[in-house]
């Protein structure tokens, strides 16, 4: 099977080019000032122009207002909106309708109880992203390099595609895919040398490892 690869939190031309050239299907840009991966509108516009149509552009926001989302859409012209906050299924549905763009909702996972709202989110979003639930004192909801128990997703069946993120690296991506059978994988801190500092060789290594794992999946 072909796995959708998303490299998230890109903020420089060089690392963005490395991701696109290596075959990333999606490239993500963070619009959240508390994140070390945050990009402003001018930079987002320049990076979006660099991508062109070579990969899908994803805009990550956290509990954003319609006004902020409109500015994000104007700057990046994203192909997908990633909602990484505590947006309700109703809010997800409203954003999808207002902006006319597909939406991916992040679902934070620590225990099986965290999957209780999954049917409602799967009915509202076009895609689900499972990420590790951050510690209570965390200042941001993702990109912390912490995995969750992938076995919680074993045997999962959803009406929409889903991706997995959280503590995934070139060294464990094959195992993450084997356990979850996810159709997509999302990496941020796993291809960094420091928070927010992407590494081109780690990006290439991650994509190579993901493509190699496809050969063992049916």
From Swiss-Prot:
It comes from the Bacteria. It is an enzyme of class 5 (isomerase). GO terms for molecular function: phosphoribosylanthranilate isomerase activity. Its EC number is 5.3.1.24. The keyword Isomerase applies. One of its GO terms (biological process) is L-tryptophan biosynthetic process. Keywords: Amino-acid biosynthesis, Aromatic amino acid biosynthesis, Isomerase, Tryptophan biosynthesis. It catalyses: N-(5-phospho-beta-D-ribosyl)anthranilate = 1-(2-carboxyphenylamino)-1-deoxy-D-ribulose 5-phosphate. Pfam families: PRAI. Pathway: Amino-acid biosynthesis; L-tryptophan biosynthesis; L-tryptophan from chorismate: step 3/5. InterPro entries: Aldolase_TIM (IPR013785), PRAI_dom (IPR001240), RibuloseP-bd_barrel (IPR011060), TrpF_fam (IPR044643). Belongs to the TrpF family. This is N-(5'-phosphoribosyl)anthranilate isomerase. It comes from Rhodopseudomonas palustris (strain HaA2).
